[in-house]
Amino acid sequence: MSCCGCSGGCGSSCGGCGSNCCKPVCCCKPVCCCVPACSCSSCGDCKGGCGSCGGCKGGCGSCGGCKGGCGSCGGCKGGCGSCGGCGSCGGCKGGCSSCGGCGSCGGCKGGCGSCGGCGSCGGCGSCGCCQSSCCKPCCCQSSCCKPCCCQSSCCQSSCCKPCCCQSSCCKPCCCQSSCCAPVCCQCKI
């Protein structure tokens, strides 16, 4: 019998089902395996489409990496985002926004926030954001960054009013405004 337009039947001369075939086995089936829309079910949604008889072509596209990881044949699972690819964190979890990739906190969790790489981890905490410059706007929210919040670079902004008067950490800047009246206004100079 003919298979997907192969005049030679199901033997070795059939030559496969052509560029529209998305199944590893094309011939010798009761139902024609060639379909108009390429599904690439065996390779995890190839970005570049399917080759002949189930193979992937195009790989992960031009963005430099897959959002969600790659399948075993080089295809993208979930497509590619605009973040420039996935780094050593093993894939962007939830997708990347415009942060430029995955930071050291184990991936962009639910997208990247304004902190510059650490999304829903709050900006601070175990991912090490607090020691870099990315958390100045947010490091005094809740109790995430009390150890580093009173550094001069943070204290001079408005982010540290709730915590910058602990002990003597902020004497040089504490007396600005009224953030530190109970403790630090002895530092008038």
Curated annotation (Swiss-Prot):
Residues 27-182 are annotated as: 8 X 4 AA repeats of C-C-X-P. Keywords: Keratin, Repeat. Sequence repeats lie at residues 21-24, 27-30, 33-36, 134-137, 144-147, 159-162, 169-172, 179-182. GO terms for cellular component: intermediate filament. The keyword NAD does not apply. The keyword Repeat applies. Coiled coil: none annotated. Interacts with hair keratins. Belongs to the KRTAP type 5 family. In the hair cortex, hair keratin intermediate filaments are embedded in an interfilamentous matrix, consisting of hair keratin-associated protein (KRTAP), which are essential for the formation of a rigid and resistant hair shaft through their extensive disulfide bond cross-linking with abundant cysteine residues of hair keratins. The matrix proteins include the high-sulfur and high-glycine-tyrosine keratins. This is Keratin-associated protein 5-2. It comes from Mus musculus (Mouse).
